[in-house]
């Protein structure tokens, strides 16, 4: 009886979530024609909030392994936006070793925060903000030999003051085009509508690409995708997510590059 109640609750949650995601934007003949003059897309995978410091089936390390070895495109490279000082993240010895492993695997180490917790940078005073930026840059430089050039602010929230501080530290803000919406780490962190979610989001991005709003870099249009590598559900489904992204491109009428991932 208890298992039935749990299953019913999960089903009810899935049904409620299904109402939050609309159908993909319809591909019109006009959009289809405009896309013919656009470069193919290539997915740029990014990961927030890591590295995990867990000693049990570490999700960040699982993600790195799946990017290296998968049936879609072995050797995918990603950008990891890191919490370099959090005790359950990069501030631990295991977290530091995971960051070193990510860099050794050819991935880009980028800055998320160097606060003890996932603190909104807008809440920090000037001295605290300067301190976390300097500390985070030093943490990453100790691994890579150079300070990071990319930042994704906690909660993706910044203002003129924090943006100016990022610029002083040589950091460029990178947000996202697509999101797995997997930022909930504790409790129910699954994504029963993950396929519909990405179909819908890519169809919206497709409309922008058709209008020439996304830049072309080296013959392809990068489409930034965001996951959370500390989410165990995401880590378990990483290879499936790779296939979903390819399926999303096909369903929405998008051309992908010969190598669809970086």
Model-based region annotation:
Residues 8-9, 161:
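Residues in flexible loops and secondary-structure boundaries
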Residues 17-19:
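C-terminal motif of bacterial Sec signal peptides marking the signal peptidase cleavage site
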């Amino acid at each position: 009886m208890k298992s039935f109640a749990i299953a019913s609750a999960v089903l009810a949650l899935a049904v409620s979530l299904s109402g939050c995601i609309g159908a993909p934007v319809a591909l019109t003949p006009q959009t289809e024609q405009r896309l013919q003059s656009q470069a193919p897309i290539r997915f740029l995978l990014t990961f927030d909030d890591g590295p995990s410091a867990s000693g049990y089936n570490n999700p960040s390390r699982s993600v790195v392994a799946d990017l290296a070895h998968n049936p879609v495109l072995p050797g995918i490279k990603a950008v990891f936006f890191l919490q370099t000082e959090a005790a359950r993240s990069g501030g631990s010895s295991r977290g530091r070793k995971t960051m070193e492993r990510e860099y050794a695997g050819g991935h880009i180490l980028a800055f998320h925060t160097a606060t003890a917790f996932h603190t909104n940078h807008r809440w920090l005073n000037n001295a605290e903000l300067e301190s976390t930026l300097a500390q985070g840059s030093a943490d990453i430089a100790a691994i890579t030999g150079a300070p990071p050039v990319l930042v994704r602010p906690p909660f993706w929230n910044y203002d003129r003051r924090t943006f100016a501080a990022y610029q002083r530290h040589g950091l460029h803000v990178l947000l996202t085009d697509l999101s797995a919406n997997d930022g909930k780490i504790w409790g129910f962190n699954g994504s029963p509508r993950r396929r519909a979610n990405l179909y819908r989001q890519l169809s919206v991005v497709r409309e922008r690409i058709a209008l020439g709003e996304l830049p072309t870099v080296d013959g392809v249009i990068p489409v930034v995708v965001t996951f959370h590598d500390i989410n165990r559900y995401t880590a378990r489904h990483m290879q499936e997510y790779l296939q979903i992204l390819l399926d999303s491109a096909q369903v929405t009428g998008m051309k992908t590059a010969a190598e669809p991932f970086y």
